[in-house]
């Protein structure tokens, strides 16, 4: 009996030891898993941040076609823009146009502004221009010019006479004729409206004439 009780005690001790080992292994696995999860989440966030920053500040941003034209119009505004810049220093080396740069390399705001057209002379510069740039016209020149324009207009009118006849009566003349016809119709209607309803006869009736004749006799 004592041997059996010892065996039971030993088996129970071994079971307790196994339970203790299992609980210890679980307790050690939990913090390890939590640390791994934290590291994994941190690595994912860092990767997303680097990708976003690379997209925001990447140097390979390109613009082509209609997008390039729209952005140039937006940046330059009323000044206008050129597709290529010409520097007067050296004409041997041709400059690349904005299409070659922005479509195949990279494009930014500073580069776009270099292709904007420079504003021309101001109004003050135009007003201070010498008056001898446009010589004044004399009266004789004006007369000749006016006479020439008149004769040329007359020639054109003569040339177009055939076309005018083919076209028929002009619209203005047709409108005038229509207006005259309408006026005549209105006058006729007014005359009819002012006419009396009953007209008195000029001659006497026959009965009255016969009655008046014996009285005279």
Swiss-Prot record:
Residues 124-217 form a propeptide. Residues 1-56 form the signal peptide. Residues 84-96 are annotated as: C. Pfam families: IGF2_C, Insulin. One of its GO terms (molecular function) is integrin binding. SMART domains: IlGF (SM00078). Disulfide bonds join 64-103, 76-116, 102-107. The record marks 79, 89, 92-93 as: Important for interaction with integrin. It comes from the Eukaryota. Residues 57-83 are annotated as: B. One of its GO terms (cellular component) is extracellular region. Keywords: Developmental protein, Differentiation, Disulfide bond, Growth factor, Neurogenesis, Secreted, Signal. It is found in: Secreted. Residues 97-117 are annotated as: A. Residues 118-123 are annotated as: D. CDD domains: IlGF. Belongs to the insulin family. The insulin-like growth factors, isolated from plasma, are structurally and functionally related to insulin but have a much higher growth-promoting activity. Promotes anterior neural development. Acts as a ligand for integrin which is required for IGF2 signaling. This is Insulin-like growth factor 2.S. It comes from Xenopus laevis.
